[in-house]
Structures are given as C-alpha cells and as structure tokens.
UniProtKB/Swiss-Prot annotation:
The lineage of its organism: Eukaryota, Metazoa, Chordata, Craniata, Vertebrata. NADP(+) binds at residues 747, 926, 981, 1014, 1043-1044, 1050, 1052, 1054, 1087. Polyubiquitinated; mediated by SPSB1, SPSB2 and SPSB4, leading to proteasomal degradation. The gene is Nos2. In normal kidney, expressed primarily in the medullary thick ascending limb, with minor amounts in the medullary collecting duct and vasa recta bundle. This is Nitric oxide synthase, inducible. Binds 1 FAD. Binds 1 FMN. It catalyses: 2 L-arginine + 3 NADPH + 4 O2 + H(+) = 2 L-citrulline + 2 nitric oxide + 3 NADP(+) + 4 H2O. It comes from Rattus norvegicus (Rat). FMN binds at residues 542-544, 546-547, 588-589, 625, 632, 658, 662.
C-alpha cells in the first residue's frame, strides 16, 4: 500500500507563545540549590530494587517534542470562528479549534443534552472485531501529522519516514504500535483535550508509565501498585498515567473493572440501610461474589478487579501501606472528629478509554489530585453518597427544619473547610475550588493564544459550590471532542463473556418483561388502594408562602390514610365543593381581616353560594398575628360559611400565632384533625398508623435531653441579636425624649430622638420602619430568676446543649448564643406573651401539686385556654405565681420560651432633613387586665424606651417598606390619614418635602393631612409643626377630628373624609391619579376603607363587587397605601379609666 500523501498536511495549528507554568505537579526532582528543569522527570525505574516491581518503560524519552503547546503551522486562510465572551470582565475569545472536532456531541438542533452524565458521544463500547483498515489509516496519519506538527522545528524526513512505516505496518498487520514518545504525546494531549477537567493547566506535567508489554492480571496489579506508590509520594501527589496494551480485536481487552483505583465499599445491610459509600453498592457486591471478604465498615478500601487479555477478572487486595488516607477534622469544631470521617488522598480514574489515532486503550488509569469540593461537597454531602449534611447542620445548631435559614449552605461550607484543613494539616496535596477556577481561566487564556480554542463543558467545570463567585461561572464555553481523547466505557461486567461459569457473579437482575409486569401490577394495586381511600383536598391561600408550606406538610400527613391533593385557592372552582369528601383549609389573614390575594376569587364565589347539594367534612387552620383584632379572621369566615352551607366541621378551627408558637400549634392541630378524620371515616388499621416523629417530638420536654455548660465566651449584645434574628443590628444612642402630650393628659406619647454612633448610620427613606430590640422589665426578670430551681449563678455565661436524636452525643443549641440566664431573660426571650397550650402542657410536668398539674392540663383545651388567656393575658411570671408549685429548670426557659421579637416603629424624620438622627413617635403603653381589675401591664418596648437615659444604647435596624413611600412623581397629590401615633410616618413625609423645596427647588403636589386625636389641648401631636408646614406650603390643608370635646359629638378621621373631603378624595383617587395613605390601627383602617368605598361607590354608581374591584386595582397600582399595626385589646380597662389602652399602639 502506498503512503497516502494527501493526509500529510491535513492538520493545521496556530502559533502562540506560552509562558512557562510553575510545576506544582511535583514531577520534578528538586536537588537543593539546583534550578529545577521543566523537562526533568522522576524515573520510576529507580524504585526497582527497593520494591521488587517489574521494570517497565516510562515517559523519560528524549524525543518528546520540545514544546507540546506550540503548534505553529500557520493556516493560509483564517477559519470561521465562534465568539466566546466572559461576562465577568468582558474579555472576548475567538474559537477556531472546534473545526478540528472529530465527532458530533449529543446535542441536536432542538434538544440540548449537555447535562447528561454519560452521553453516547462520550462513551466507547466494546468491539467484536478489529477496526477496519480504511477507518484506522486516516486516523493514524492524522495523529502522526499532529505529533510532528508540534515540534518547534519541522522534521520532514523523520515525519515522512514515520508515515511510511505506519502505513506499511497497518497494511501488514491491520494495526500499528505507537512509539513511547508518541504515547507520551497522546496521553498529555488527551488530558489537554478533556472538556470536563478543571485542572488542565498541568496537562504537560503528566508522568507516563508504559505497561503495554503486560500480559497477565498479576502484572497489571504490580504496575498499578507502582503507579499508586509514585503518585501518592507520601502526600505530595504527582499526576501520572499507566497505559496497558491497546485493544486488538475486542475479544482480548485489558480492563480495570474498578471505577477508581482506590474507592470505598458500600454494603446493603439486612435492615435496608446502607453502610459505606452507596455509590459502590453494585461493584461491592460483585467483589463479594468474586470471592472478596467484606469487612462491613464505613471506609473499607475495595480490591482491584483486573482483566487481562480478555480473560475472566481476578481480585487483588491493595496493600494497606499503599493507601494514604486523611482523617477529617475541623479547625474550629472539635466534635467534627467524632463523625469518624476520612478519605483517600489519591483520586485515580480507572475505567476510561484512551483513543488516539484510531487506536483504543481500554485500560489506562490516571490521576491528578483532589479539588476540595469533590470530597467535601460531592462525596460527603450528596444525598446518594455519605449524606452527612443534615447531621453536621444539627451539630452546628442550625435550623435544619427550614430551608430559609440557609443551613445547607452554612453546613456545606464548614464541611468543605474541614476537608481542606485536614489535607493541608497532614501535608497532602489538595486545591480549593477558587484556586482551581482561577487556574482554569489562566489555562483557557493560554489555549486560545496557543491553538485558538479550548474545549470546555461549563456544567462540569463550574464548582458545586460558590457558583457566580468563581470566574468560570461567567465564562462562555464551547464543548467539542478532539483527538486524542479519554472516553467513558460501559461497565465491563455488563458486557464480559465469562469463560469460567463458576466465576460468574450470581445474577440478580430482573428480566425487563418481569419488571414491567411487576411495576404495572403494583401501580394497579396502588390505584385501587388510592381509589378506595377517602379523597382529601387541601386548599391554601398565602401571601408569603408559609400557608402553602404548611398545607403541603398537612397533605403529607394525611397521605398516610387518605387520597390527598394540594390546591391553591385561585386554581380551585367553587362548584367542585359538591364533589368533596374531606376539605382541609390552611390560610393566612392579610391586612384588615382580608384574605390573601390568591384567595380573592374563591372567596367571592364561596360567599355568594346559598347552599350545598352534597355535604362533606372540613377543617380549617388559620395563620396570623394576635397583635391584630382580626386575628385569623379569614380562616374563621371560611369556617362559618362552610358551616352555614351545611358542611360538617371535623375539628375546631386552629389558630397559628406568629407571635407565639405557630409551628407547635399547627402540628398539634394537624395531629388532632388527622386522628379525628381517621375515626370519622373509619380508616382501616387506623390504630396501626404511625404518625411521623416530627409531629409528636415536641409534645413533651425531657430534662435528660438538655444540659447547661459553662462557657468562657459571650457575644456583645449587637452580635448576639444579629445572630439570633439574622439582622444587621447597629447601635444608636438616645439623644432626647419629649412628651408630645400636654400636662392635662394622663397618657404619654414620646418624640424619641436617636443619634447614630459614628459619622453616619445606615440609610433610610421616609415611611420606612426602625426595628428596636427592647429589654424586658427588671422586676419580671428577677421574679422569674427567683423561681428557677437550678439558677445559683444567673450571671454566669452558659451554653445550652441538646442530646442528638441518636442519643449518642451533645450538640450546642444555636437558637441562643452563649449568654447568662439573666441576659437571655432580659434581651433574648419573650416573657410577657402568654404561654401557648403546648408550653402549658410541658410545664405541667414541673408542678409538684396535683391540683396545679390538673389545672395546667385543663388549660390545654382550647375553650379553657382562650378564656384564661384573654381574661388574664398573663406574663410568664404571672403563670409561675398562679401555679407556685412549679419548679422550672433553667434549660427549660432557654429552650422553650419564645424569642423576643423586635418592635417596629414608623420613622418620623427625613434623613435629608436630620442626617445623623432618627426620630420616632412612641405611645407608652400601660393597661390592666380582667376588665381593669387585673395587674398592671406595660408595653415591652415603649416602657423600655421611656426608661432610657440620654446616651443609653438602642440596638436597632432599618426595615424597608417599599409599599409606603412618597410618590416617585412629587407633583402627584396625596391625602395622608393618620390619627394618634399614625401621624408618625407623615412627619417624615413633610420633612422630606420641606427639604426638597428648600434645597432642591422641587415643588410637590397637594398634600392634605387628616389627623385625629381626643382633645386639642391634650394630645394634638405636632400641632405647631403642622401649622408651620401649612404656612410654608408643604401641607395643603390639615383637617383634625376630635373625639373627646365636651358637649360635642365624637369626630373621627372617617367622618372628616365623608363630610369635608368627599370631593377632594374622589378627585385625588379618580381624577388626578393621586395617592392615599392610611396609617394607624386596624380598626381605624377598616373604618376608613369602608367610608372610602361608600364614597367612591356613590360617585361612580358602583355595586359592592365593583367597588371592591376598584380598590383592588388602586392597591395593585400602588396608589392606596396602608401601614397598619395592631395590639388593640379586648381586655382593656373600663371606660374612663386613665390606663385605657390607646387604639393602635405598638407595644
């Protein structure tokens, strides 16, 4: 056969100079005082006599191209390029190398398969005959051209001679053999071409071991041991590859059946659990079937399963002294070592195939070194692997029950930090994912400069954590296949033809037809079971997503006995109520007793229904805040409407108070409702249904599961509050307090002036809120401390520890940072909100008198509890006083009392007008329970503020309120409605308008203020300031309603709207597209809304439904704004009592 010269100059490459890369691969032998040479490599033959391994050829040949990365055949014409952009820095690459791609990837014109793990285009299967000569020859010549094209200086004669020799060898034998130099070149170029490898910057520093003369499995084992010894290098990892004989006819392959040279076993235990690495279950069982003796540990190194010359595989145990393992520990958490984790130091891929010049090498194990996330994120945290994430999260004290706490992110970061720390401490080579990403970006720049492209698989190269923080995230990439290349292979045990049937592993596979029949039969049975079950529909309406989460939780519980489905109210048709058997509703209450926006449509349809043709059972759970008088109003409205329609209530309507034990209340109600449903519908085997532990684990409090330990460290107050509430807490100082009410008034409303520490604090806008973290009253705290049974040192810093679910170790409870019991009761825990029913149930165990215990148990019933709660509104101290036999431990208080929440106040100043200050308008709250006959109670925050002295610190943070700000267009007219302390945000409005007028020359539109109070000589807040704003033209008009003028009828803000401002309101809202703002308590807001709707309905002749839609549109357009607060009490003092609770006051 003549040499096909037409192939000679097919390969074209591109010029480019590359800077010499630092050898961090440890392949270079470093003599002290000598300058390392980049071409010097460690010769493994030097280990021959020490280890007794056979001699074999290594990559130290002298005829390797001087610079593999300088391919410099200049093209005569510039190929068409693809533009690649880095969206992080704007850098542009032009890829021309993709024209040399040798095969199509899996993606199609209408289908992207980039995220498929092992696509067909990247996988080579077995062969049953040699590669045809007509296929082999062009590929061989293509590779020879590529090899000789990589030299700095052309070697024409040698190039032509080699082409001639290869051609004749193929013609004579049907195949050809690579020289050592060509093999070294091929292995390195295959690494260079690997699109899924992030560490390719080291591609030229690969040590090549030539084991092509190997003939038996025993020899393979010795070569692999040599590889492991060299590459491990006592922890100073060196990248290496061992190449075994090439494929001939496909029937005499050399294969390594392991996916990695070193990997841990995974065992399926009798109880169904998995011990070890779940990813290796199948291969571990294969090893056992082949005669390996399992040890059933978590980290057992699997044996090598080696196939030589197509023979049946043989099993070889790796000598333990060859396997370097790293024990995991954390730089901060001592308990991390208790997890008993470790990992092997050498990541050596063993099951890939090297393709080069038409030749295939199905056994070519190679290694680099680890990137930390491969172990810390994938091996340890993947759910299908060791899956330690939640255990670490619990030990860290994170809120693993809620995704919004970001516990997964925090835990995986610490696990990754532990891996890096452990490897570095034991001097084992590892690279963090940020450094790896940076190195790849450098490699990519080099490649585009050197050869006009760099194949890269973005999905694989972006690390599994940090995302856009790494530079590779922002880099566009092209993915294509070049030759030489490393391909995936089909697992050998799936295609191997066994010669000794005795060695064949026991077949466990189920035939496909049998499997299909089994699945079909099971699905039929399940359909029958589900069809026979009672249908349960779970409806939800939500603004924040909380109700939906609880609805799905409820459906999961009911799915143990019912055929459940979850539906949002906006997707539910009211006429389908006729088909229901069991209806469960979970909904929040929004605004002034309204339903959430996604429940509006169903509410209208439901409340227009007159009767049901078919009745059903139902139960309702409402979420809300007891600060508002319309607490869970929408849930109760649904309950009443369904009852009136004839449906039967399955369980009393549940209430979840966001201020007190909402989750506990839901779990208790869910279990109660589930059991009632099982009884009502006579569910088969209802007594055998095991309710999930998470619904019942909080029902009791076991002292032996908690303990207090002394802690030498404690956080300062701001850091502690930031940790507890996940807020950016800063300190302000009290400048002054001024009582805005006159001496004639028995009440107190404060103008609170706070100053920033430092030159300037966080920015804020008019209408936004300041959240303040108050302290509980000293008398309440001391009273509780005196009744705690194990509190000898209330000022000693302690840490609460909780016994893990397994009962094997203690973990720190991160709900509270280390603190003293006094500090916790003062600043961190809510001791004024009445205990929940569940808390009373837990308290009952500490009562030493039986009558007290029985009474506490009785209060766990909803009717008893509600009467007791709303009559007494007891603080925790009053509960201890009512039941004096209670002996409560400190751990109970730290673990069970609710967190003291911040109090929000509308900011009453403009930052432009008073740059270094924040002003608040605060009503000081005092009231008596039991119709004025009970003990005197004080608002937590208002009382705390009233007792502050100048320069006292105030921990706080700014909360943005995007829906309650001045119009973007200052020319739009506004109506501001705010009686009492509802005036607070409007003071910031007029200060901002004053500043804009004086310093920016901006003239605002009409701003009409409607204010309300009792008497002009008692509580007309900011009266003189309002008058000044009118004189300066900032306020257009001020209208005031007085409700306590002697001899005159009570006038409220809604009366002014109806009698004096009807035309102005209609003009602003309808004619001029202006804005209306309402700030105050919910009752006032409801009355104002009712008045406005009547006014607009009369002006436009609208029906009730039409006017509701009109105001819904106003809110959607963000022209009707409400800032509503609650804390209006049904247990207020009798009329005339000087301690009567002011409406709408924040506590």
């Amino acid at each position: 056969m003549a040499c096909p010269w037409k192939f000679l100059f097919r390969v074209k490459s591109y010029q480019g100079d590359l800077k010499e890369e630092k050898d961090i691969n440890n392949n270079v032998e470093k003599t002290p005082g000598a300058i390392p040479s980049p071409t010097t490599q460690d010769d493994p033959k030097s280990h021959k006599h020490q280890n007794g391994f056979p001699q074999f050829l290594t990559g130290t040949a002298q005829n390797v191209p001087e610079s593999l990365d300088k391919l410099h055949v200049t093209p005569s014409t510039r190929p068409q390029h693809v533009r690649i952009k880095n969206w992080g820095n704007g850098e542009i690459f032009h890829d021309t190398l993709h024209h040399k791609a040798t095969s199509d990837i899996s993606c199609k014109s209408k289908l992207c398969m980039g995220s498929i793990m092992n696509s067909k285009s990247l996988t080579r299967g077995p062969r049953d005959k040699p590669t045809p000569v007509e296929e082999l020859l062009p590929q061989a010549i293509e590779f020879i051209n590529q090899y000789y094209g990589s030299f700095k200086e052309a070697k024409i004669e040698e190039h032509l001679a080699r082409l001639e020799a290869v051609t004749k060898e193929i013609e004579t034998t049907g195949t050809y053999q690579l020289t050592l130099d060509e093999l070294i070149f091929a292995t390195k170029m295959a690494w260079r071409n690997a699109p899924r490898c992030i560490g390719r910057i080291q591609w030229s520093n690969l040590q090549v071991f030539d084991a092509r003369s190997c003939s038996t499995a025993s020899e393979m084992f010795q070569h692999i041991c040599r590889h492991i010894l060299y590459a491990t290098n006592s922890g100073n990892i060196r990248s290496a590859i061992t190449v075994f004989p090439q494929r001939s006819d496909g029937k005499h392959d050399f294969r390594i059946w392991n996916s990695q040279l070193i990997r841990y076993a995974g065992y399926q235990m009798p109880d169904g659990t998995i011990r070890g690495d779940p990813a290796t279950l199948e291969f571990t069982q294969l090893c056992i079937d082949l005669g390996w003796k399992p040890r059933y540990g978590r980290f057992d190194v699997l044996p090598l399963v080696l196939q030589a010359h197509g023979q049946d595989p043989e099993v070889f145990e790796i000598p333990p002294d060859l396997v370097l393992e790293v024990t995991m520990e954390h730089p901060k958490y001592e308990w991390f070592q208790e997890l008993g984790l470790k990992w092997y130091a050498l990541p050596a891929v063993a099951n890939m195939l090297l393709e080069v010049g038409g030749l295939e090498f199905p056994a070519c194990p190679f290694n680099g070194w680890y990137m930390g996330t491969e172990i810390g994120v994938r091996d340890f945290c993947d759910t299908q692997r060791y899956n330690i994430l939640e255990e670490v999260g619990r030990r860290m004290g994170l809120e693993t029950h809620t995704l919004a706490s970001l516990w997964k992110d925090r835990a995986v970061t610490e696990i990754n930090a532990a891996v890096l720390h452990s490897f570095q401490k034991q001097n084992v080579t590892i690279m963090d994912h940020h450094t790896a990403s940076e190195s790849f970006m450098k490699h990519m720049q080099n490649e585009y400069r050197a050869r006009g492209g760099c194949p890269a698989d973005w999905i694989w190269l972006v690390p599994p954590v940090s995302g856009s923080i790494t530079p590779v995230f922002h880099q566009e990439m092209l993915n294509y296949v070049l030759s030489p290349f490393y391909y995936y292979q089909i697992e050998p045990w799936k295609t191997h033809i066994w010669q000794d049937e005795k060695l064949r592993p026991r077949r466990r596979e189920i035939r496909f037809t049998v499997l299909v029949k089994a699945v079909f039969f099971a699905s039929v049975l399940m359909r029958k079971v589900m069809a026979s079950r009672v249908r349960a529909t779970v409806l939800f309406a939500t603004e924040t997503g909380k109700s939906e989460a609880l609805a799905r939780d409820l459906a999961a519980l009911f799915s143990y006995a019912f055929n459940t489905k979850v539906v949002c109210m906006e997707q539910y048709k009211a006429n389908t109520l006729e088909e229901e058997q069991l209806l469960l509703v979970v909904t929040s209450t929004f605004g002034n007793g309204d339903c959430p926006s996604n429940g509006q449509t169903l509410k209208k349809s439901l409340f227009m229904m007159k009767e049901l043709g078919h009745t059903f059972r139902y139960a309702v759970f409402g979420l809300g805040s007891s600060m508002y008088p319309q607490f869970c109003a929408f849930a109760h409205d649904i309950d009443q409407k369904l009852s009136h329609l004839g449906a039967s209530q399955l369980a009393p309507t549940g209430e979840g108070d966001e201020l007190s034990g909402q989750e506990d209340a839901f779990r208790s109600w869910a279990v109660q409702t589930f059991r009632a449903a099982c009884e009502t519908f006579d569910v088969r085997s209802k007594h055998c249904i095991q309710i999930p532990k998470r619904y019942t684990s909080n029902a009791t409090w076991e002292p032996e599961q908690y303990k207090l330990t002394q802690s030498p460290e404690s956080l300062d107050l701001n850091k502690a509050l930031s940790s507890i509430h996940a807020k950016n807490v800063f300190t302000m100082r009290l400048k002054s307090l001024q009582n805005l009410q006159s001496e004639k008034s028995s009440r107190t409303t404060l103008l609170v002036q706070l100053t920033f520490e430092g030159s300037r604090g966080p920015s804020y806008l008019p209408g936004e809120h300041l959240g303040i973290f108050p302290g509980n009253q000293t008398a309440l705290v001391q009273g509780i401390l005196e009744r705690v049974v194990d509190c000898s040192s209330p000022d000693q810093t302690v840490c609460l520890e909780v016994l893990d679910e397994s009962g094997s170790y203690w973990v720190k409870d991160k709900r509270l940072p280390p603190c003293s019991l006094r500090q916790a009761l003062t600043y961190f825990l809510d001791i004024t909100t009445p205990p929940t029913q569940l808390q009373l149930h837990k308290l009952a165990r500490f009562a030493t008198e039986e009558t007290h215990r029985q009474r506490l148990e009785a209060l766990c019933q909803p009717s008893e509890y509600n009467d007791w709660k709303f009559s007494n509104n007891p603080t925790f101290l009053e509960v201890l006083e009512e039941f004096p036999s209670l002996r409560v431990p400190a751990a109970f208080l730290l673990s069970q009392l609710p967190i003291l929440k911040p109090r929000y106040y509308s900011i009453s100043s403009s930052q432009d007008h008073t740059p270094s200050e924040v002003h608040l308008t605060v009503a000081v709250v005092t009231y008596r329970t039991r119709d004025g006959q009970g003990p005197l109670h004080h608002g937590v925050c208002s009382t705390w503020i009233n007792n502050l002295k100048p320069e006292d610190p105030v921990p706080c943070f700014v909360r943005s309120v995007s829906g309650f700000q001045l119009p973007e267009d200052p020319s739009q007219p506004c109506i501001l409605i705010g009686p009492g302390t509802g005036i607070a945000p409007f003071r910031s409005f007029w200060q901002q308008r004053l500043h804009d007028s004086q310093h920016r020359g901006l003239k605002g539109g009409r701003m009409t203020l409607v204010f309300g109070c009792r008497h002009p000589e008692e509580d007309h807040l900011y009266q003189e300031e309002m008058q000044e704003m009118v004189r300066k033209g900032v306020l257009f008009q001020v209208h005031t309603g007085y409700s306590r003028l002697p001899g005159k009828p009570k006038v409220y803000v809604q009366d002014i709207l109806q009698k004096e401002l009807a035309d102005e309101v209609f003009s602003v809202l309808h004619g001029e597209q202006g804005h209306l703002y309402v700030c105050g308590d919910v009752r006032m807001a409801r009355d104002v809304a009712t008045t406005l709707k009547k006014l607009v309905a009369a002006k436009l002749n609208l029906s009730e439904e039409q006017v509701e839609d009109y105001f819904f549109q106003l809110k959607s357009q963000k022209r009707y704004h409400e800032d509503i607060f609650g804390a209006v009490f049904s247990y207020g003092a009798k009329k005339g009592n000087t301690l009567e609770e002011p409406k709408g006051t924040r506590l």
